[in-house]
C-alpha cells in the first residue's frame, strides 16, 4: 500500500509542508519500485515534442536539484534537449548541465558540438550558459576548445558573456596550468573592459591565475578605482583586497614620519619642524634624522584609492565594509583611519556570525589604534543574549581599550560579568581583570584584592581561574603579599582543578622563604595524594620537593626522597624523566657532581614576571578580514601583505592619458555616424549639428551665432569668435597640415554618397562652404574622427572667415527653430528686462553659450546585425524636445537592413519597464528593403533616473530584446536665466542639495571654449552669463520633475578648480558631478 506514494514522490512530486521527503523510501522504495522506473514520467515529458511539457519537466528537475536530490540519472534525457528551440527550456537545460557536466563527462562530450553552437546563439544568456557548461567539463582533451571559446567570449558584445569568460579562466587554469600565458592575455584584455559587470570577475581571475603580474594593474588602476563604487558587492570585495596589496607595493607608507611627529600627527604630511622644537632633549638626534627623511606627500593615486573607497563604508554588505576597513587600516594615514570605527560598530548590530568576524578584526585594530574605538566603548558592552564567543571577543576589545581614564567603568562592567552563569565567560573575565592589573599599575592592588575575594566563591572554576591570575600578579610584587600566599596554601585541600593546584604549588615553592612553616606541610599533603594527582600537579610537586630540599633539607629530605621514588615508577615518562633529572641535580653522588653544587642557582633563580598580552597582538601581520587572520594561521592560497617600499616606484606607469586620448578618438569615429542624423533628420537644429561636427573654433562660433536673436548680437559674437579662434589655432597650428590632408581624403571618399544623403534633407547645403558640406553630407556608414578635429584646429588666419561663413548660414537656415529646445514652462525668468540684465554684464559671457549642444555620447548600438539576423539598430540622444510629451527624452532610432530579404512590420513590442518609466513608440515601419536604411523618432520618459528602459523590437517573424540606459546628462533640458536669478536659485539649494568636489584641470582644458564645450557635451545645460572670467555657470531642469540643476565651475590658478552642483535631486547631482569631472580631467 505504501508503494504508491513512494513511487509518486520519486516521479518528482514535491512533499507537502512538514512532510518528510524520504519518509516512504525505507519501507517500500527499495523493494517494490525498481531503479529503472525512477523519474520515468519526467523522461517521457522530455521526449515529447511539446515545449510546454519539456518546460514543466525541466522546472521539476531543477527544483529537485535545489532541494539536494540526485537527478544525475536524467542526464541522457536532458542533454538531448540542449538543441531545443524554446529559449526557456534551453536555459533550464544549461542550468542542469552546469551541475552535472563534470560527473557525466562522457555524455557531455557527445553534445560538445551543440555547446559550441550555443556560443554563437543570439541570446546572451545562452552564450554565457554554453560557456559555463563547457568550462564545467573537466576533461583535458577539450582544453583547446575551451581556450578558443574563452577568447571569443572575452570579445563578446554582452558584458554578461564577458563576465562568464572571466569566471571560466580560473577553471581552465586549474585544469591545465600550461595555458597560463594565453590566459594572461585574455585577463589583460578583460582588465581594460570599462563595464562594471566585468571588473570584479576579471580581478578574481587575475588573483587566482597571475597575482604576481602587477604590471597588468598599472594602466587599469585609476579605472578600477573610479568603477569601484558601481561594481557589485562581491566584486568590490575582491578589487579592494587586490588594490590593498597593490598600494603596499607602489606607494610610500603614510606613517613613515610619525616617529618624528608623535606630538602632532596632523602635520605628518608637511614636515617636522614643530616636533623638532618640542623635544629639546632629543633635538640633536631629531636634527640628524630630518635630512634623511623628506616630508611625506601622499601620491595622488594613493589619495584616489582612499577617496573612492570611503563611501563604501556605508554599504549594506558587511563584507564590503570590512574590506574598506582593512584597506584604511593598512593604507591610510593615522589621522584618517578613525573613519572606519563608526562603520565597524554599525556592523555589531548584525548577525552573530558577522559580529564574530568584525570583533576579531576590531580586537586586532584596538591594540595598535586604541584611540580609534574609545568613543564607542559602550558599544562593546556585553549583552546577556550574546553567544559565548561574542562575549569573549567583546571582553578582549574592552581590555584593549582600558586606560587610566576609563578603567573604573571597565572594572565595574567586569564585576557584573563575574556573576554570569556562563563559566567560560567568567574565566575569560578574570583573565581580563588580570591583564588590566598588569597594564595599569594604579589599579593593581584593587584588582588583586578583588581576585582574592573570589577565592571564597562557591564555584570551583571561578576560584581556580582566580588562583592562576593571582599567581601571575604576585610575581610582580611577591614580598608584599605573603598573606595571600598563605591563604592560597589553605585552598589546596578544596580546589580540585589541576591548573589551580599546580599554580598554588608553584607559588609556594617559588616563595618558600616567605612561608617557611607552611611549605613542608603542603609537601606532606601532596606526597600522600601524589599517585592520584594529574600530571601537571605531579610535576609541580617534584619542583616543590626539590626547592624545599635545597632550602630546608632537615625537614624535607625524607619527604623529597619519597616523592622522587613515587615519581620514578610513574606511568608517564615525563614524570619519570623529571624525577631522574631532579635527583641527579639535588642529591650529590659519590663522585660529587659539578651540577649539584649549582643546584640552588638552577632551581631558585629569580624569574621575570609574566607579561599578560592579548592573543591578538601579533595577528596584524596577516591581512585583516582574511581567513588567515581569523584562524591566526596561514591558510591555503593566502597572499602575504607586502611591506611598504623604501623608495616610491615610478608613478608614471599609471599614466594612461595619451593612449586613452587615442582610444577616445578612435571610439569617437563611431560618432561620425550621427552627423547625417543631425544634418538630415534634424535640419532645424543647426547649432547641435555644428557643435559636434566642426572644429572647436567653428562649433563655438556656430553656437554663438545660432543662440543670438539679432544681427547685432551675431556680429559682436563673430568678433569674439575670431579672438578665441586665434588663441586655439596658434597653440596647435603645427598639426593643421596633417589634418587638411585627412579631410581631403575623406571628401574624395564620400563625395557621391554624401551628396545623395545631404540633398535629401537640406536644400540650403548647395551654398554652404566646403568644410560644412564635407561634414553635413557624410554617409551614416562611413566614419571620421571628430575628436582629432577638435584637437587639431586650423590656423587662425584661415579658420576665422570659414567660421563666419558657417555662422551666417546657420543663422539664415536654422535660427527660427533654435528657440524650440526651451519651452515656456522650463524658463525661470519670464521678464525680458531681467534676461537683458544678465546678458549685458559682459561681452565675453555670451561667447560660448551653447544652448543645445551635441551629446558626447554620440550614436550607440542598440542591436547588432549578427544578433538581429541582418537588422542593425542604432540610437542617439537628439537633445530636442519630444513633440508627443515634453517630459520625454527624444531619441533617433536608425534601422539598417543588412540581410538579403526585406524586413517587414518593424514596431515596438510590449515593454517591460520599471515603475514610472514610459515609452512613446515610433510608428510601425511596414517594410525595409535589403540594403536600405531609415530613421525614426521615439520618446522615453526615464522618470529622472538612469534606469534602463527595456523593450522589444519586433518584426513579423522575430522579437529582439533591447535596452537603452541614459547618461544623467541627457535627463535635463537647458534653461535661460540671468546671473541674479542663478544666485537666487542657488541660495535655495544648499546643504544636502549641494555637492562640491575639487579637481585639477589639465593643460588642454583651461581655455574658456574647451571648458564650456566639455561641460555642455556631458550635460544638456545652458550657459548662464557670469561677470567674472574664471567662473562658469550652467543651468537646466530635469525633464520629468522640472527640478533645477545648477552647475558652477570655479577655475583657479595652476589648473585648480572647484565644481559645485545644486539640485533637489541629490542622486542626479552626485552622478552629474562624477560625469563632469571625468569629462574635464580626461
UniProtKB/Swiss-Prot annotation:
Looking at the keywords, is DNA-binding present? no
| Similarity section | Belongs to the adaptor complexes large subunit family.
- Start-end of Low complexity biased regions: 704-715
Query: Pfam families, alphabetically?
Result: Adaptin_N, AP3B1_C, AP3B1_C_2
The primary site where this protein sits is: membrane
Tell me how this protein assembles.
Answer: Adaptor protein complex 3 (AP-3) is a heterotetramer composed of two large adaptins (delta-type subunit AP3D1 and beta-type subunit AP3B1 or AP3B2), a medium adaptin (mu-type subunit AP3M1 or AP3M2) and a small adaptin (sigma-type subunit APS1 or AP3S2). AP-3 associates with the BLOC-1 complex.
Name where it's found.
Cytoplasmic vesicle, Clathrin-coated vesicle membrane; Golgi apparatus
Q: Which SUPFAM superfamilies match?
A: ARM repeat (SSF48371), Clathrin adaptor appendage domain (SSF49348)
* UniProt source species: Mus musculus
Protein name in UniProt: AP-3 complex subunit beta-2
Q: Name one GO biological process term.
A: vesicle-mediated transport
Composition bias (Basic and acidic residues) maps to 666-677
Q: Determine if Phosphoprotein is one of this entry's keywords.
A: yes
Point to the regions of Acidic residues compositional bias: 691-700, 716-726, 775-784
Here the disulfide bonds are: none
Q: Which InterPro entries match?
A: AP3_beta, AP3B1/2_C, AP3B_C, AP_beta, ARM-like, ARM-type_fold, Clathrin/coatomer_adapt-like_N, Clathrin_app_Ig-like_sf
Q: Which residues carry this modification: Phosphoserine?
A: 272, 282
Topology versus the membrane: Peripheral membrane protein
Amino acid at each position: 500500500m505504501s508503494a504508491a506514494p513512494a513511487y509518486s514522490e520519486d516521479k518528482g512530486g514535491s512533499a507537502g509542508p512538514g512532510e518528510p521527503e524520504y519518509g516512504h523510501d525505507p519501507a517500500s522504495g527499495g523493494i517494490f519500485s525498481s531503479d529503472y522506473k525512477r523519474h520515468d514520467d519526467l523522461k517521457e515529458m522530455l521526449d515529447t515534442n511539446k515545449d510546454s511539457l519539456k518546460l514543466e519537466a525541466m522546472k521539476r528537475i531543477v527544483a529537485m536539484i535545489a532541494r539536494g536530490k540526485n537527478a544525475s540519472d536524467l542526464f541522457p534525457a536532458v542533454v538531448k534537449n540542449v538543441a531545443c528551440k524554446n529559449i526557456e527550456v534551453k536555459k533550464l537545460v544549461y542550468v542542469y548541465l552546469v551541475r552535472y557536466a563534470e560527473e557525466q563527462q562522457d555524455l557531455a562530450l557527445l553534445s560538445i558540438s551543440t555547446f559550441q553552437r550555443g556560443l554563437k546563439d543570439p541570446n546572451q544568456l545562452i552564450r554565457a550558459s554554453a560557456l559555463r557548461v563547457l568550462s564545467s567539463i573537466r576533461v583535458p582533451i577539450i582544453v583547446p576548445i575551451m581556450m578558443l571559446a574563452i577568447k571569443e567570449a572575452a570579445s563578446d558584445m554582452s558584458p554578461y558573456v564577458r563576465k562568464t569568460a572571466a569566471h571560466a579562466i580560473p577553471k581552465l587554469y586549474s585544469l591545465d596550468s600550461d595555458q597560463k600565458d594565453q590566459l594572461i592575455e585574455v585577463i589583460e584584455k578583460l582588465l581594460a573592459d570599462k563595464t562594471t559587470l566585468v571588473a570584479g570577475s576579471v580581478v578574481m581571475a587575475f588573483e587566482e591565475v597571475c597575482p604576481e603580474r602587477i604590471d597588468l594593474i598599472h594602466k587599469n588602476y585609476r579605472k578600477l578605482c573610479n568603477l569601484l563604487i558601481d561594481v557589485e558587492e562581491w566584486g568590490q570585495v575582491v578589487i579592494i583586497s587586490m588594490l590593498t596589496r597593490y598600494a603596499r607595493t607602489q606607494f610610500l607608507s603614510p606613517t613613515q614620519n610619525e616617529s618624528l611627529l608623535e606630538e602632532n600627527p596632523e602635520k605628518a604630511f608637511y614636515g617636522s619642524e614643530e616636533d623638532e622644537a618640542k623635544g629639546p632633549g632629543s633635538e640633536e638626534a631629531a636634527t640628524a634624522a630630518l635630512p634623511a627623511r623628506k616630508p611625506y606627500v601622499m601620491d595622488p593615486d594613493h589619495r584616489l584609492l582612499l577617496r573612492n573607497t570611503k563611501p563604501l563604508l556605508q554599504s549594506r554588505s558587511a563584507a564590503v565594509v570590512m574590506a574598506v576597513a582593512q584597506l584604511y587600516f593598512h593604507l591610510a594615514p593615522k589621522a584618517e583611519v578613525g573613519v572606519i570605527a563608526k562603520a565597524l560598530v554599525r556592523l555589531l548590530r548584525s548577525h552573530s556570525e558577522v559580529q564574530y568576524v568584525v570583533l576579531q578584526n576590531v580586537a586586532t585594530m584596538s591594540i595598535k589604534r586604541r584611540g580609534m574605538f574609545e568613543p564607542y566603548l559602550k558599544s562593546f558592552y556585553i549583552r546577556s543574549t550574546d553567544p559565548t564567543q561574542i562575549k569573549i571577543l567583546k571582553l578582549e576589545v574592552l581590555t584593549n581599550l582600558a586606560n587610566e581614564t576609563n578603567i573604573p567603568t571597565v572594572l565595574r562592567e567586569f564585576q557584573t560579568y563575574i556573576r554570569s552563569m556562563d563559566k567560560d565567560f567568567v574565566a575569560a573575565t578574570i583573565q581580563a581583570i588580570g591583564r588590566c592589573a598588569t597594564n595599569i599599575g594604579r589599579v593593581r592592588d584593587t584588582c588583586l584584592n578583588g581576585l582574592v575575594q573570589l577565592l571564597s566563591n562557591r564555584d570551583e572554576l571561578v576560584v581556580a581561574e582566580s588562583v592562576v591570575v593571582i599567581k601571575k600578579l604576585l610575581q610582580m610584587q611577591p614580598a608584599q603579599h605573603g598573606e595571600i600566599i598563605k591563604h592560597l596554601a589553605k585552598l589546596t585541600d578544596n580546589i580540585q582543578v589541576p591548573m589551580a593546584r599546580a599554580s598554588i604549588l608553584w607559588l609556594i615553592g617559588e616563595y618558600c622563604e616567605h612561608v617557611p612553616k607552611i611549605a613542608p606541610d603542603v609537601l606532606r599533603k601532596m606526597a600522600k595524594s601524589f599517585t592520584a594527582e594529574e600530571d601537571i600537579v605531579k610535576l609541580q610537586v617534584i619542583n616543590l620537593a626539590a626547592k624545599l630540599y635545597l632550602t630546608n633539607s632537615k625537614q624535607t629530605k625524607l619527604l623529597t626522597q619519597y616523592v622522587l621514588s613515587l615519581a620514578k615508577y610513574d606511568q608517564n615518562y615525563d614524570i619519570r624523566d623529571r624525577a631522574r633529572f631532579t635527583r641527579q641535580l639535588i642529591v650529590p653522588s659519590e663522585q660529587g657532581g659539578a651540577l649539584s653544587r649549582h643546584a640552588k642557582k638552577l632551581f631558585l633563580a629569580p624569574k621575570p614576571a609574566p607579561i599578560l598580552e592579548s592573543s591578538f597582538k601579533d595577528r596584524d601581520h596577516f591581512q585583516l578580514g582574511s581567513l588567515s587572520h581569523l584562524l591566526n594561521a596561514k591558510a591555503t592560497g593566502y597572499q602575504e601583505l607586502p611591506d611598504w617600499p623604501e623608495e616610491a616606484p615610478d608613478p608614471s606607469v599609471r599614466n594612461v592619458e595619451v593612449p586613452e586620448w587615442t582610444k577616445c578618438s578612435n571610439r569617437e569615429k563611431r560618432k561620425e555616424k550621427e552627423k547625417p542624423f543631425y544634418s538630415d533628420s534634424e535640419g532645424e537644429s543647426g547649432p547641435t549639428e555644428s557643435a559636434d561636427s566642426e572644429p572647436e573654433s567653428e562649433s563655438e562660433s556656430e553656437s554663438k551665432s545660432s543662440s543670438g536673436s539679432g544681427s547685432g548680437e551675431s556680429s559682436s559674437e563673430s568678433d569674439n569668435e575670431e579672438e578665441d579662434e586665434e588663441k586655439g589655432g596658434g597653440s596647435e597650428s603645427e598639426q593643421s597640415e596633417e589634418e587638411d590632408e585627412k579631410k581631403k581624403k575623406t571628401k574624395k571618399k564620400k563625395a557621391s554618397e554624401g551628396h545623395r544623403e545631404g540633398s535629401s534633407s537640406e536644400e540650403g547645403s548647395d551654398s554652404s562652404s566646403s568644410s560644412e558640406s564635407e561634414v553635413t553630407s557624410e554617409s551614416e556608414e562611413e566614419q571620421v574622427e571628430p575628436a582629432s578635429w577638435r584637437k587639431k584646429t586650423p590656423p587662425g588666419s584661415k579658420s576665422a572667415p570659414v567660421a563666419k561663413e558657417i555662422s551666417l548660414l546657420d543663422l539664415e537656415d536654422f535660427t527660427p527653430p533654435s528657440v524650440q529646445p526651451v519651452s515656456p514652462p522650463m524658463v525661470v525668468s519670464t521678464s525680458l528686462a531681467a534676461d537683458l540684465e544678465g546678458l549685458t554684464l559682459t561681452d565675453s559671457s555670451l561667447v560660448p553659450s551653447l544652448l543645445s549642444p551635441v551629446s558626447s555620447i554620440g550614436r550607440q548600438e542598440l542591436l547588432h546585425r549578427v544578433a538581429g539576423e541582418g537588422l542593425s539598430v542604432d540610437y542617439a540622444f537628439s537633445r530636442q524636445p519630444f513633440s508627443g510629451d515634453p517630459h520625454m527624452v527624444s531619441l533617433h532610432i536608425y534601422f539598417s537592413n543588412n540581410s538579403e530579404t526585406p524586413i517587414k512590420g518593424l514596431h515596438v513590442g510590449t515593454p517591460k519597464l520599471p515603475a514610472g518609466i514610459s515609452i512613446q513608440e515610433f510608428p510601425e515601419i511596414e517594410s525595409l528593403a535589403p540594403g536600405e536604411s531609415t530613421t525614426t523618432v521615439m520618446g522615453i520618459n526615464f522618470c529622472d533616473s538612469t534606469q534602463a528602459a527595456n523593450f522589444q523590437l519586433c518584426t513579423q517573424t522575430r522579437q529582439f530584446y533591447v535596452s537603452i540606459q541614459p547618461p544623467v546628462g541627457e535627463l535635463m533640458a537647458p534653461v535661460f536665466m540671468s546671473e541674479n536669478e542663478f544666485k537666487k536659485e542657488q541660495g535655495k539649494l544648499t546643504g544636502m542639495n549641494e555637492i562640491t568636489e575639487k579637481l585639477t584641470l589639465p593643460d588642454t582644458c583651461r581655455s574658456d571654449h574647451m571648458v564650456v564645450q566639455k561641460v555642455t557635451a556631458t550635460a544638456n545645460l545652458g550657459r548662464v552669463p557670469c561677470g567674472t572670467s574664471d567662473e562658469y555657470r550652467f543651468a537646466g531642469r530635469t525633464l520629468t520633475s522640472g527640478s533645477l540643476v545648477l552647475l558652477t565651475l570655479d577655475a583657479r590658478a595652476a589648473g585648480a578648480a572647484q565644481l559645485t552642483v545644486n539640485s533637489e535631486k541629490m542622486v542626479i547631482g552626485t552622478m552629474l558631478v562624477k560625469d563632469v569631472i571625468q569629462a574635464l580631467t580626461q
